[in-house]
């Protein structure tokens, strides 16, 4: 089911409620203990905080982000990564909904240190990190494209200061916005999802 929840972004509570209810109904039917949010800041926010208010009750399950789950599995020794580490100079963009609102700051860094031999922080990282420019549904508004590209200038300064060979993030929305802006500025910088990077280095 769609979890990003365009209803919340549009301010339409009925659509928002319907989208959350589908996930809740499926989770209850399966009697799951956890619903794992993917690399999407808005999905995590919609399910974790907005969802119970929209459906009018507390969940019988827990919503966790994929990064929280991966970090937990690593700590429990249930997944292991290869001894060979990624040698590229990488940095991490903190998605606003996941980090600032969700408080998931340490987990992505724990995972990055497991797979990267050259991870470097940007200035003002974590809860102080600068938005990608597409937050609050701005990425869906074509009229805001010029402003979105302009606001990326602040993020570009952060990136230029550390000179990464790859930019890692954990939100599909951030990734799309960052890729568009990087292309607009003619930067040679691949954007990776943290989950896919970890997957590359999982030990069989």
Task: Map each language-model feature to its residues.
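Iron-sulfur cluster-binding electron-transfer modules in prokaryotic oxidoreductases
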Residues: 1-204
